[in-house]
Amino acid sequence: MPKIIAAKTIVTCPGRNFVTLKIMTDEGVYGLGDATLNGRELAVEAYLTQHVIPCLIGRDAHQIEDIWQYLYRGCYWRRGPVTMAAIAAVDTALWDIKGKIAGLPVYQLLGGACRVGVMVYGHANGETIDETLDNAAVYAQQGYKAIRLQTGVPGMSGTYGVSKDKFFYEPADSDLPKETIWSTERYLRSTPALFEAARERLGDDLHLLHDVHHRLTPIEAARLGKDLEPYRLFWMEDATPAENQASFRLIRQHTTTPLAVGEIFNSIWDCKQLIEEQLIDYIRATVVHAGGITHLKKLASFADLHHVRTGCHGATDLSPVCMGAALHFDLSIPNFGVQEYMRHTPETDAVFPHAYTFKDGMLHPGDAPGLGVDIDEDLAAKYPYQRAYLPIARRLDGSMHDW
């Protein structure tokens, strides 16, 4: 058996902060796992260092399920974003080790490929509708079949999804939370115009997506979904805060626009009702936030029973280690829908060399043993941690709103 003899965390900031767990075995094989929790990275790093790593030493690295249960049930204070990100890092690293020892890519260990590649969607955004659609046209020319559209809301600077750079979006970029303003009324008036213009310019063949980012009440979300029906969206994401899962029932009753939610979910219990009652069409839980490949595979199987497909979160707050793991997962499940894909900075790609490649609107994880993603520790050390917060939002009257 490959025995775990050491493990360590690597914190680096090649454009944004990432926490990577490296697990070493007595056979000389190591595995990597992503433990990044956007804006709270050091909390997970401390949890791993102080509470998880000491419990791993001497264990059989092949016993992935048992180690997962040990870390989940054994901590008593189960679930939550910090605990589940730490468990995810361990789980992902163990799958990486297992694949390397077997000489197989992880997707082969998960049952083999169900498709030739993983359809991904890019992010097109801009201060104006024309600017957003100009950027969308670039993605279409690059071969993307699915594109998320976000645009500025008139009279509101710093709207969610509008980046400072044309294609790189890093919202966690300030030493203290940046304050933005929000008006639901202006947003509801302007958003349908974006998609009307998009269909006129981009045609009917592209899949179009939109992220509300938890900002609407259920009835407001129902109204927006109804207004967007003529433009046949692939999905409307995070239409309302999902703490109350039953709130999606009201939205579902009023619109046929497909609904997606789940990037902030940490376990199957956060979305059990949503899936069981078919209140959503896509579940967006991802490897690093939902306990790793082991738990996400179970969640996807449960979703498959209820005709819910996956659409894993894949923004740049996840490192290439997580993206690689997500692609192996995506390739292996029958109910895959789409994978979010935001390109990392060149500095990040240099720190995390990877085997996955893009072609014709799809990513493929490659056939290197394990995850096919590595880390250059010397280069990572040149990019020290930098504290960074996500923005916050206030309504026009000064009260707090969901960002």
From Swiss-Prot:
It catalyses: D-mannonate = 2-dehydro-3-deoxy-D-gluconate + H2O. Gene3D superfamilies: Enolase-like C-terminal domain (3.20.20.120), Enolase-like, N-terminal domain (3.30.390.10). The active site is at residues 160, 213. Pathway: Carbohydrate metabolism; pentose and glucuronate interconversion. GO terms for molecular function: magnesium ion binding; mannonate dehydratase activity. InterPro entries: D-mannonate_dehydratase-like, D-mannonate_dehydratase_GalD, DgoD-like, Enolase-like_C_sf, Enolase-like_N, Enolase_C-like, MAND, Mandel_Rmase/mucon_lact_enz_CS. Its EC number is 4.2.1.8. Mg(2+) binds at residues 211, 237, 263. Keywords: Carbohydrate metabolism, Lyase, Magnesium, Metal-binding. Its cofactor is Mg(2+). Belongs to the mandelate racemase/muconate lactonizing enzyme family. GalD subfamily. This is D-mannonate dehydratase CC2812. The lineage of its organism: Bacteria, Pseudomonadati, Pseudomonadota, Alphaproteobacteria, Caulobacterales.
